[in-house]
């Protein structure tokens, strides 16, 4: 696979070999970064970050990754500061921005926006989240985190908790896990179950999938619990949101039933689904997970720029 110039739009576009290439490159760059403090692979290259939706971790970690590689960053953190506010189309925005940069990272509220950007642009485009659809770079850092913590992904029991209907991180992660020998536990309110087409696809690919509404029934089996917030901004009706708000909270009492080896992940931001008292336990790895976004995004940028 020639990575130079490649778009990163959906985890569905990846083979297992592609995923392993990214994880191995991230491991190498993390090691080099610790040894040298600053790398020069992307010297003279410019990243444009186009964020039409709010972001803290994804935007800052991409910008940090590009700086760590020796490159530069331009872009905007909200659509209101761009000509989109004047009515400019996404197509024209992309065609304009690519004149200034070597790679584009885009987050957009509309599903399919990243794919459209990739079709229009001559430079590589990386999807930083499109609506409730896909978030492939989060998935890659999640897999990297699991592999760092356990030394493997195969053989693990992994639970996804919370908003499995609108949560793009869990859609991408579930699809990527079909490449591995894992058992998947889907824990959500009835209203927020994983979309049927995704569950059917997982089972067709031979994955053992268990669906439940009760965390306490399965937490003792899990190696990884991946927690998500209930995403108020994705609900078409506030009454629907209020029905499921606060459905779950991971706290010390819940963790009494957990294995010592259980590791808790969260793509963040959190609301109240993980109590702060969990932060200092051996189970919590969500802030280490945040750090892992930098080497993984360094790897993706270096690969699509063809500098590594």
From Swiss-Prot:
MF-aspect GO terms: amino acid binding; aspartate carbamoyltransferase activity
Annotated pathway: Pyrimidine metabolism; UMP biosynthesis via de novo pathway; (S)-dihydroorotate from bicarbonate: step 2/3
EC number: 2.1.3.2
Pfam families: OTCace, OTCace_N
SUPFAM superfamilies in UniProt: Aspartate/ornithine carbamoyltransferase
Entry keyword annotation includes Transferase: yes
Family per record: Belongs to the aspartate/ornithine carbamoyltransferase superfamily. ATCase family.
Name by which UniProt lists this protein: Aspartate carbamoyltransferase catalytic subunit
Organism expressing this protein natively: Pyrococcus abyssi (strain GE5 / Orsay)
The encoding gene: pyrB
């Amino acid at each position: 696979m020639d990575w130079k110039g490649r778009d990163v739009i959906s985890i569905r576009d990846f083979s297992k070999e592609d995923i392993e290439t990214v994880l191995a490159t991230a491991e190498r760059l993390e090691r080099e970064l610790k040894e040298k403090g600053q790398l020069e692979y992307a010297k003279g290259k410019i990243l444009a970050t186009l964020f039409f939706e709010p972001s803290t971790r994804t935007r800052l970690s991409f910008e940090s990754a590009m700086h760590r590689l020796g490159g530069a960053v331009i872009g905007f953190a909200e659509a209101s500061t761009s000509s989109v506010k004047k009515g400019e189309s996404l197509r024209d925005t992309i065609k304009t921005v690519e004149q200034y940069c070597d790679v584009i990272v885009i987050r957009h509220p509309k599903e399919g926006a990243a794919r459209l950007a990739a079709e229009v642009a001559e430079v590589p485009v990386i999807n930083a989240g499109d609506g409730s659809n896909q978030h492939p770079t989060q998935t890659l850092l999640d897999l990297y985190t699991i592999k760092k913590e356990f030394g493997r992904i195969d053989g693990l029991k992994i639970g996804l908790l919370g908003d499995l209907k609108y949560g793009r991180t869990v859609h991408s992660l579930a699809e990527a896990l079909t490449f591995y020998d894992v058992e998947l536990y889907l824990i959500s309110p009835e209203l927020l179950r994983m979309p049927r087409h995704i569950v059917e696809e997982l089972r067709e690919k031979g994955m053992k999938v268990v669906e439940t509404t009760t965390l306490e029934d399965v937490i003792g089996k899990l190696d990884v619990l991946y927690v998500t917030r209930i995403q108020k901004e994705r609900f078409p009706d506030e009454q629907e949101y209020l029905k499921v708000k606060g459905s779950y909270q991971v706290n010390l009492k819940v963790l009494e039933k957990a294995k010592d080896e259980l590791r808790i992940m969260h793509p963040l931001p959190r609301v109240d689904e993980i109590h702060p008292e969990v932060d200092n336990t051996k189970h919590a790895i969500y802030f280490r997970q945040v750090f892992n976004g930098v080497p993984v995004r360094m790897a993706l940028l270096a690969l699509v720029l063809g500098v590594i």
